[in-house]
Amino acid sequence: TTLLGAVDAAVGGKTGINFNGLKNEIGAFRPADTVIVSTQFFQTLPQNELLSGYAEMLKHGLIDNPATYRSLLDFDLSMPDWEKLLPLLKESIQVKERIVAEDPFEKGIRKALNLGHTIGHAFESLSHKRETPIPHGFAVAWGLICELLLSHRYLKFPSETISELAAYIYRHYRAFPITCKDYETLYELMTHDKKNEAGYINFTLLQTIGKPVIDCHVDKEEIFVAFDLYRDLFKL
């Protein structure tokens, strides 16, 4: 009944629950027999719930292609046209379906769907530690900015694209407040991420829109630089 459920949780058969303040610590792969999406439910959602789901759609656009991404940026979230949302929603679901069909158990390209989630999950867990929980999609939106900043440093992702998305994110989602005192806590939370291998924190980064690069090992110092740049970008 939420936009987030329709574009993310309902597709791909991955189930997970949080445990001990950490995201998705326990879970399984179990595809549904049937998934039915009705946009009528979305029309009664609070704005925060609409925004939360839309962040996952933005992620799908980033890993898919420039045309999909541009159509999402051009959609007016402040006054949603539900007829125009439907094809965007359908395309977003199909992006995830195509990736899941190719890699159902997340051994390869399905990891592209984790864009924004390594740092996003850390933001989300920190918000729970602060006892001021944030919606999942908001955490993903802010995580996208941080991980695109890493993408620029590691893969030369275009800085102008980051600036445009950051302005969009700030307009609709504002910014998650962090200081340098939070860096170690955020890093420690990231060490519990299920995508990590051999002691490395694994990221999905982007070379450009539509060209994700999975299993990127990022140094602690570079993660902290990304936090610095995030704070500079949002004037925190």
What are these regions (language model features)?
Residues 44-49, 81-83, 133-135, 196:
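Structural motif
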Residues 36, 114, 204-206:
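Short beta-strand segments
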Residues 1-77:
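A glycine/threonine-rich phosphate-anchoring loop and its flanking beta-alpha core
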Residues 55-58, 157-236:
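C-terminal charged capping/lid subdomain of soluble metabolic enzymes
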Residues 70-184:
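Active-site segments that bind and position negatively charged phosphate/pyrophosphate groups
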